[in-house]
């Protein structure tokens, strides 16, 4: 997906669909059945994934995420072509291809590279002061990752280091496999809010060119009953399309990152709180 993001090539739905349509035109004299068309589409998908791995150096997680969409897109184009090249005159068929190609190539011009945010919250049975002391930096998270993509190899948070509790303090959010997000504190309200900008992301193949994380934030709400609501947010921009598909995965991943960190904060805050 990195190459698609950097070069601004068409959506990973439209481009494979066009590929499937062209393939069905090439296959038309063979008159393949629907089953053979599906099998041929599977081979096309596997070849595309191998190309992504060896030519564009895409990560395994990225390829796993994109593979269902790629297969369905190629298959949709191939099945549409199977009907088109059976039913309509040759001249009409060929006149449609330039129009479809124009639509695919012009699709990137319609994109809005807007910023998105994902927010999660948990309840902690400890006062805000106890939670805050565990928030600004923390040691290695002892719990093994639960999210299946983390276990499959996607980098996950393991610790955070901070230069101090003040604005402009440098932070490091340390992920597995040596991935480090460098951050800078831009807003700090003791016992209430911590906001930091992400100034440098790791050059991980699962991340580069796919999305840009901009900033993160923790907000503490004192519930006046000895408990605290911890709210974690991340702002980001996606560089791959279709947005609805990749945003689904991105939000799912960010939510798993948030909850892994916040659940460890809760564990440490509640342990330090006498019962």
Residue ranges of model-derived segments:
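Short strand-connecting beta-turns/loops that link adjacent beta-strands
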Residues: 127, 177-178, 190-191, 223-227
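Hydrophobic ligand-binding cavity/cleft-lining segments
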Residues: 1-9, 14-21, 26, 30, ...
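Beta-strand/loop substructures that line and gate deep hydrophobic ligand-binding cavities in soluble
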Residues: 34-39, 43, 47-52, 57-58, ...
């Amino acid at each position: 997906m990195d190459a698609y993001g950097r070069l601004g090539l068409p959506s990973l739905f439209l481009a494979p669909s066009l590929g499937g349509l062209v393939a069905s035109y090439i296959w038309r004299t063979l008159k393949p059945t629907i089953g053979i068309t599906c099998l041929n589409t599977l081979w096309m998908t596997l070849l595309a994934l191998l190309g992504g791995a060896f030519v564009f150096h895409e990560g395994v997680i990225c390829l796993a995420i994109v593979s269902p969409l790629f297969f369905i897109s190629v298959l949709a184009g191939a099945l549409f072509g199977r009907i088109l090249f059976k039913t309509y005159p040759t001249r009409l068929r060929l006149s449609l291809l330039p129009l479809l190609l124009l639509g695919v190539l012009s699709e990137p011009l319609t994109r809005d590279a807007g910023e998105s945010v994902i927010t999660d919250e948990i309840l902690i049975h400890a006062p805000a002061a106890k939670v805050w002391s565990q928030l600004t930096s923390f040691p290695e998270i002892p719990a093994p990752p639960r999210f299946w993509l983390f276990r499959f190899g996607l980098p996950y948070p393991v610790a955070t280091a901070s230069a101090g509790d003040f604005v402009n303090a440098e932070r490091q959010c340390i992920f597995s496999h040596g991935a480090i997000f460098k951050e800078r504190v831009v807003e700090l309200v003791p016992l209430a809010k911590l906001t930091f900008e992400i100034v440098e992301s790791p050059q991980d193949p699962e991340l580069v060119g796919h999305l840009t994380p901009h900033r993160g934030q923790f907000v503490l709400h004192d519930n006046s009953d000895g408990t605290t609501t911890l709210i974690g947010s991340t702002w980001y921009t996606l560089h791959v399309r279709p947005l609805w598909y990749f945003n689904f995965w991105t939000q799912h991943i960010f939510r798993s990152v948030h909850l892994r960190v916040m659940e460890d904060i809760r564990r440490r805050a509640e342990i330090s709180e006498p019962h």
